């Protein structure tokens, strides 16, 4: 696939499927090393379309359960001087329970876990074709910030996973 960056399609407003802000409450977090690249299917004509995200044998995704719109995701362009521009992915999450399992997961994240986040947006497009987005697929997301305070946000643990600077 060429890296020429030639615009090939119109950017139109789909009045039958207007965008809606937000993501669904359940997020899948996957250890990047648990993804089976040989069984994962990327559309040969569209490198942004993954039709099958496969995990290695006996590996599973971790569910981060949210409520309302406390979790969010974003992407921002990172201009590169000597290579093609990249996208920095950011997932902002909230751990609603501070039990041992949650603390263990956050500790594992802080020890350098490389993660992939699969989110389902509220804006799904025609026939749900645009419902899912995969963040950190190529380079993984790492824990960037984590904050807990008994005096803020109902005592929940706020954290951010993002592409590592320079490794988008």
Where are the regions a protein language model picked out?
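Solvent-exposed edge beta-strands and adjacent loop segments
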Residues: 2-90, 139-151
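Generic structural motif
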Residues: 18, 30-35, 96-100, 122-124, ...
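Mixed-charge, glycine-accented linear interaction segment located at domain edges/termini
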Residues: 134-168
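Structured, beta-strand-rich domain cores
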Residues: 67-135
């Amino acid at each position: 696939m060429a890296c020429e960056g030639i615009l090939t399609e119109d950017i139109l407003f789909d009045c039958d499927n207007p965008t809606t802000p937000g993501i669904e409450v359940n997020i899948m977090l996957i250890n990047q090393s648990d993804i089976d690249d040989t069984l994962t299917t990327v559309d040969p004509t569209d490198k942004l379309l993954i039709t099958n995200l496969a995990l290695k044998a006996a590996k599973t995704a971790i569910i981060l359960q949210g409520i309302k719109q406390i979790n969010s995701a974003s992407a921002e362009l990172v201009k590169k001087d000597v290579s093609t521009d990249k996208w920095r992915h950011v997932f902002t999450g909230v751990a609603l329970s501070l039990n041992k399992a949650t603390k263990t997961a956050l500790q594992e994240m802080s020890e350098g876990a490389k993660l992939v986040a699969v989110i389902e947006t509220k804006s799904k497009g025609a026939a749900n074709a645009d419902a899912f987005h995969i963040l950190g697929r190529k380079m993984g997301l790492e824990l960037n910030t984590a904050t807990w305070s008994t005096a803020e946000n109902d005592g929940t643990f706020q954290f951010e996973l993002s592409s590592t600077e320079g490794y988008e």
